[in-house]
Amino acid sequence: MAKAKFERTKPHCNIGTIGHVDHGKTTLTAAITKTLHERLGTGEAVAFENIDKAPEERERGITISTAHVEYETEKRHYAHVDCPGHADYVKNMITGAAQMDAGILVVAATDGVMAQTREHILLARQVGVPYIVVFMNKCDMVDDPELLELVDMEIRELLNEYGFPGDDTPIIQGSALKALEDPNSEWGDKILELMHTIDEYVPDPERDTDKPFLMPVEDVFSITGRGTVATGRVERGVLHVNEEVEIVGIHEDIRKVVVTGIEMFRKLLDEAQPGDNIGALLRGVQRDEIQRGQVLCKPGSITPHHKFTAQVYVLTKDEGGRHTPFFNNYRPQFYFRTTDVTGVCELPAGTEMCMPGDNVEMTVELIHNVAMEQGLRFAIREGGRTVGSGAVATIIE
């Protein structure tokens, strides 16, 4: 059967359900697809069973089960991720396997805020999920409006505590199960209200081409009489010939240079776009003044740092990780973009050691600078073997 062509007519947004186990994340995901399909005639309804038995994927050596569904509102096309298990969420968010432009936090009105509700909000904050919209589920099982109000307050306080705008965050009350049973009921209206709220509250994500230019340097060579060429894959933004860029990373100082030519597959280009594997000819740069591990970027868009806090997932033995815990002052390699940098891990006060399978916040000090920003992903390696995965949470220096 021929595959349908993906029509890019609407803005695209990546979204996902987060929240405590059994609060109804997967039921809500199914209810959204069914309600939008029946009420707006968009997309396809995906059954609960098909979301729940998500296939295992391997992302950077880590086994993650994730279900991907898509749906559309009148305004946008959404790609939605839902994970069956709590550990899958932790891995997913930290590895950036599924980058989210926004999260739908599902909280059961019958339980209120639970342990994983808290952990998922913390993770969302640490890895840089910019927006959260709340769906208070199972409201059909709560008769007391005062109880709903208490849960509402509890959620807002928690969001504030982790640096989200709790007072202004939309909270939609509904029942995913009732909406799934009858999308045309008032419970179905609540699903439409949720999606309309997400359309309005979450701004259109910035496209990769609109972001400031960045290309990690993979290789460097010199062409006699022409200068030095840095090669790599454009991560974001657009580069034009004769534009000025900065060389950032490894050293304290930042060097400005002009790109006098761009090549791809031995052909000359006027501009390079995200995903292009290019060679950038740099004016007046010596072969030894730029190296793998640095980046070329739009001037002023990213700065070099060596000390930061990070949210880290430690691989289990089965995932090919360590068989034993590690302790404070552990010194592995941190793999950023194209290169390994040695660093020292400082565990949180009161944490003696870190076991395989743990998710931990740590402070890291690298032996030299890396072009860094919040949300940047990295791998932790020992002798070329990946033993952990992380995201930069805050930059210290």
From Swiss-Prot:
G3: region residues: 82-85
PROSITE patterns tied to this protein: G_TR_1 (PS00301), G_TR_2 (PS51722)
CDD domains according to UniProt: EF_Tu, EFTU_II, EFTU_III
Region G2: start-end pairs: 61-65
Subcellular location: Cytoplasm
Sites where the protein binds GTP: 19-26, 82-86, 137-140
Sites where the protein binds Mg(2+): 26
Residue ranges of domain tr-type G in the record: 10-206
GO molecular-function term, one example from the UniProt record: GTP binding
Sequence segments annotated as region (G5): 175-177
Region of interest: G4: 137-140
Recorded GO CC terms: cytosol
Keywords, ordered alphabetically: Cytoplasm, Elongation factor, GTP-binding, Hydrolase, Magnesium, Metal-binding, Nucleotide-binding, Protein biosynthesis
Record region (G1): 19-26
Superkingdom of this protein's organism: Bacteria
Catalytic activity: GTP + H2O = GDP + phosphate + H(+)
Family: Belongs to the TRAFAC class translation factor GTPase superfamily. Classic translation factor GTPase family. EF-Tu/EF-1A subfamily.
Assembly with partners or alone: Monomer.
Family annotation (NCBIfam families): EF-Tu, PRK00049.1, PRK12735.1, PRK12736.1, small_GTP
Full protein name: Elongation factor Tu
Organism ancestry: Bacteria, Bacillati, Bacillota, Clostridia, Lachnospirales
